[in-house]
């Protein structure tokens, strides 16, 4: 198996320098599973498959236990009742845990070595090649030369969706080139409308995230200079302390 990374391994928006790591939540006990599934389906607006949601929720605890058994121990929150521990899509506190970026790099880096995965960092995918109706390899740019890698199958496990947009809150190295390559060979991007969009400042600090908790100190005006939220202001202030933005 060959793993190609456009930058260094463990890079991109997921490892953005301004973030500490990854937060994850689990049902707060067996009785919380149904509520978590309902919360996911509410945000899904009818697009989420109930059976898939149920399988996802039931798989969280076993997945975390598997990490623990293999040596990656999530951190527990000191004060679990802080509003910051409510996920952006959710409506209540659950069992919050965290994984630091450094712990993830060490753990998964070792796993890749143990599985004899060959890593090609700083390598750019240029195109996929086909034989008949099947992908049979990839053309890449690596160490100042173009290479063809023959392969029985290719998995594009890539992020970069923010690169589809002119205004984005990610670093400039985030690219959507792989999505163009996938489109070129017949794949389609679906459910783009369910991406999480975060508001950002236009000025004076373009590219800075506007956190939902800043709503309570903000005055929002329409094009005529009139206040947008005179009615139900207290309700909007309460909602602004948690996600998702669609409810704020």
Task: Pin down the residues of each PLM region.
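Glycine-rich active-site loop/strand segments that organize a redox cofactor
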Residues: 22-56
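Conserved redox-cofactor binding core of oxidoreductases
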Residues: 60-145, 153, 157, 198-203, ...
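Glycine-rich phosphate/pyrophosphate-binding loops
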Residues: 2-4, 161-162, 166-169, 177-180, ...
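N-terminal leader/propeptide and maturation segments of large enzyme subunits in energy/redox metabolism
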Residues: 49-58, 71-74, 232-233, 241-248
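An anion/pyrophosphate-binding glycine-rich loop and adjacent beta-alpha core
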Residues: 181, 187-248
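Glycine-rich FAD pyrophosphate-binding loop
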Residues: 1-17, 28
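Glycine-/small-residue-rich beta->alpha transition segments that form the dinucleotide
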Residues: 7, 151-153, 157-162
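A short alpha-helix-loop-beta-strand transition element characteristic
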Residues: 14, 47-54, 64-81, 188-191
